[in-house]
Amino acid sequence: MNKKYILFFLFGLLSITISAQSLAEAKALYEKGEYEEAKPTFKKLVKTQPGNGNYNLWYGVCCLETGEPAEALKHLESAVKRRVPSGQLYLARAYNDLYRFEEAIETYETYISDLRKRKRSTEEAEQLLEKSKS
């Protein structure tokens, strides 16, 4: 009986270690802009922890950057609900890619307002906002 518990514990520990390695690898790929390669790991992580805002952001950005704005949308909305930094920027881009310009404009404006409150540069977001308006 004790052997079963030990095996179960070791298997669980191994799974956590593999998951951590996969996350670290996926984040490294993401940071390098290798979104297609990082996407499967983030997809698995979102399935196991759908409430994790960062996982939703990373997976959503991977989808957006690989030409899947519709798939990205729900994950980016989830990230924004959980107040993940930069989530609004990518959500606005997804709205824009889906021709939902009013929502894109509103989201960019909210993002710019948040940046100003934190005394951060708004230049990139303002350029994207103007692009959505035209």
For the regions a language model picked out, list residue spans one by one.
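Canonical tetratricopeptide repeat
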Residues: 58, 90, 124-128
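Alpha-helical segment of the N-proximal tetratricopeptide repeat
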Residues: 21-44, 48
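Register position in tetratricopeptide repeats
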Residues: 31-32, 65-66, 97, 130-134
